[in-house]
């Protein structure tokens, strides 16, 4: 399913489900903060009651088409159960990624005991702005950069915005590159986050394939590889991360691939059509997602990993073992507690002495933040660009977001650098608000999802280490919650088949000093 909210036909909630909201429903039938699914002129719409107020907005998330009627109402927002996008109940605005586009909003009237929703109202997220920069330059056209550009325009900023990228065609739905697109379930037209025509329509200059080579923080300029010089009032560094390689013989061979860009994914797909056996090096999230996708294409797949249990350092023993069983049930072979020694033309030789046939090799061995540009500009760098609670870097007017940013986490008190798509997008949105003088400290709880065949794992929070793990439910029944604690405090929650519980856990982690379960 596409993440491009403007050019893709998204699935929707059933447009005939529930009552005709133009005809009206009884006020007393609306439970507090409990969405009621109905329809208006063939469009699925939800009603939400808060006290005497009634809100009516579109029922289909603009990210991947999730059903907002099954979401969680928090204040004047509703959170999508699939990937935790947030929409304003009053305006329909997409307040929190991964959704970037608003849903429709509708007028609501009370006629005695009846509540009727009527005409669509204009979505207007604009608020009075503080002092705004003369121009904005965004270096990096990934998740954070694209989300920042969108939010600047959504909030009413009218100055020049330039979005500078490293590659064609511009911002893409990167999670799909290891999931549905790589598996062959998503066409290429689903992959762009936004089209060039979209950026032209909102007057954002997209500069693909011309990366920044130098920043002068004193003059507030950045120079691109082409020699073009851009002046900025505010600058966002969203340079992301670079896939790691391996220091072994054969890693430079033509059938060995990293997986980060659309070009990478296309190259893997092309090679997959020519061979029967693939080896994935690294039992990481991206490595395992790639393994699942290549199995879907009919290849024999072996995953090589140094750990004894896949993802144990992130998900714990029980959930890690479940992930392994799931992949084995789908035909993946594992060589764990092992590592590659040499990659040859048709085989991978392991440290254990095993030799595995491989016409295709995919590296999923982690990433390194791209900090060279920040370092050359004199910014403070320590395992990422160091930023404050408002994502401001150490030079005036400069911000950082996404995989490259290391920020103070208000929940744990630690400095974090998170490599999650949704976190990057939300940080980009937060930077846009900060640039316009309408933001506050970045406080979002980290969230990611990982798809393995027909099983999605949702994870909220951040637990680099823990001293207790609690499993609730049945993993093999695909209905479970895993809670990670340290010194009695809940740090993170993973769920399978419990979407609303994942949303509730995210909210508890944000609002409760010591969230309990």
What kind of feature is each model-predicted range?
Residues 92, 252-275, 347-349, 354-430:
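FAD-site-proximal beta/loop scaffold in flavoenzymes
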Residues 133-137, 404-500:
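Mid-to-C-terminal Rossmann-like scaffold of FAD/NAD(P)H-dependent oxidoreductases
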Residues 169, 175-192, 266, 277, ...:
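Rossmann-like dinucleotide-binding cores of NAD(P)H-dependent redox enzymes
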Residues 239-297:
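Glycine-rich dinucleotide-binding loop and its adjacent helix/turn
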């Amino acid at each position: 399913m596409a993440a491009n909210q403007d050019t893709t036909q998204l699935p929707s909630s059933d447009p005939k489900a529930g009552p005709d909201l133009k005809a009206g429903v009884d006020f007393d039938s609306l439970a507090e903060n409990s969405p009621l699914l109905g329809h208006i002129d063939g469009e699925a719409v939800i009603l939400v009651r808060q006290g005497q107020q009634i809100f009516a907005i579109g029922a289909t998330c603009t990210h991947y088409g999730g059903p907002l009627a099954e979401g969680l109402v928090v204040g004047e927002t509703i959170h999508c159960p699939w990937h935790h996008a947030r929409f304003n109940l009053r305006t329909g605005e997409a307040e929190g990624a991964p959704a970037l586009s608003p849903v429709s909003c509708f007028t609501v009237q009370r006629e005695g005991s009846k509540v009727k929703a009527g005409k669509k109202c204009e979505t207007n997220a604009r608020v009075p702005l503080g002092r705004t920069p003369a121009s904005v330059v965004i270096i990096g056209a990934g998740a954070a950069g694209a989300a920042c550009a969108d939010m600047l325009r959504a909030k009413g900023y009218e100055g020049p915005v330039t979005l500078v990228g490293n590659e064609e065609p511009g911002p893409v739905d990167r999670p799909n590159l290891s999931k549905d697109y790589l598996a062959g379930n998503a066409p290429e037209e689903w992959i762009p986050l936004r089209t060039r025509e979209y950026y032209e329509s909102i007057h954002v200059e997209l500069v693909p394939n011309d990366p920044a080579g130098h920043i002068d923080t004193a003059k507030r300029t950045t120079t691109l590889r082409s020699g073009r010089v851009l002046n900025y009032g505010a600058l966002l560094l969203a340079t992301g991360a670079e896939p790691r390689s391996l220091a072994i013989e054969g890693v430079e061979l033509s059938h060995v691939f990293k997986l980060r860009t659309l070009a990478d994914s296309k190259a893997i797909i092309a090679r997959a059509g020519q061979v029967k056996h693939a080896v994935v090096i690294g039992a990481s999230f991206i490595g395992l997602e790639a393994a699942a996708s290549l199995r879907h294409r009919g290849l024999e797949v072996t995953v090589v990993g140094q750990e004894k249990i896949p993802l144990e350092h992130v998900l714990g023993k029980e959930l890690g073992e479940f992930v392994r069983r799931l992949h084995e049930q789908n035909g993946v072979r594992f060589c764990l507690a092992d590592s590659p020694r040499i990659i040859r033309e048709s085989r991978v030789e392991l440290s254990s002495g095993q030799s595995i046939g491989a016409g295709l090799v995919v590296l999923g061995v982690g990433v390194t933040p791209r900090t060279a540009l920040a370092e050359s500009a004199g910014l403070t760098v320590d395992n990422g660009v160091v930023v404050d609670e408002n994502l401001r870097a150490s030079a005036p007017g400069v911000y950082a977001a996404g995989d490259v940013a290391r920020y103070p986490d208000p929940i744990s008190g630690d400095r974090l650098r998170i490599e999650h798509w949704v976190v990057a997008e939300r940080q980009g949105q937060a930077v846009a608000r900060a640039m316009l003088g309408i933001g506050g400290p970045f406080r979002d709880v980290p969230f990611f999802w990982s798809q393995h065949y027909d099983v999605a794992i949702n994870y909220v929070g951040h637990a680099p280490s823990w001293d207790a793990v609690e499993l609730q439910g049945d993993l093999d029944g695909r209905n479970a919650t895993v809670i990670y604690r340290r010194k009695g405090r809940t740090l993170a929650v993973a769920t399978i088949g419990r979407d609303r519980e994942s949303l509730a856990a995210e909210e508890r982690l944000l609002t409760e000093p010591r969230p309990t379960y």
